[in-house]
Swiss-Prot record:
GO terms for cellular component: cytoplasm; ribonucleoprotein complex; ribosome. Keywords: Ribonucleoprotein, Ribosomal protein, RNA-binding, rRNA-binding. InterPro entries: bL21-like, bL21-like_sf, Ribosomal_bL21, Ribosomal_bL21_CS. It comes from the Bacteria. This protein binds to 23S rRNA in the presence of protein L20. GO terms for biological process: translation. This is Large ribosomal subunit protein bL21. It comes from Clostridium perfringens (strain 13 / Type A). It holds the Pfam family Ribosomal_L21p. Belongs to the bacterial ribosomal protein bL21 family. GO terms for molecular function: rRNA binding; structural constituent of ribosome. Part of the 50S ribosomal subunit. Contacts protein L20. PROSITE patterns: RIBOSOMAL_L21. PANTHER family: 50S RIBOSOMAL PROTEIN L21 (PTHR21349), LARGE RIBOSOMAL SUBUNIT PROTEIN BL21M (PTHR21349:SF0).
Length: 103
């Protein structure tokens, strides 16, 4: 059994037990979150596709950690003009494990 869900503007194909790094969710570590935007569910060879979401379907996940990704360095410059700007960005993420798919 698997499900296709959307969170943080991205889509993920998940099964029970999968560990994901998703865009930051407002949840405490070791708490559970319900992801209700389930686009498709496959069970016993039968695929149910929502329009746009599957009615009554949800994915229950447990938050393992909150953190920041590796730093991305943004360096802008204009040649011959002594213009240089160095900037860094670390995207926050949430590490979750899929506990249950309900459909």
């Amino acid at each position: 059994m698997y499900a296709v869900l959307t969170t943080g503007g991205k889509q993920y194909r998940v099964q029970e037990g999968d560990v994901l790094f998703v865009e930051k969710l407002n949840a405490e570590v070791d708490s559970t979150v319900e992801l209700t935007e389930v686009l498709a569910v496959a069970k016993d060879g039968e695929i149910k596709v929502g329009a746009p979401v599957v009615e009554g379907a949800k994915v229950v996940a447990k938050v393992l950690a909150q953190g920041k990704a590796k730093k991305v360095v943004v360096f802008k410059y204009k040649r011959k003009k002594d213009y240089r700007r160095k900037n860094g960005h670390r995207q926050p993420y949430t590490k979750i494990v899929i506990e249950k798919i309900e459909a």
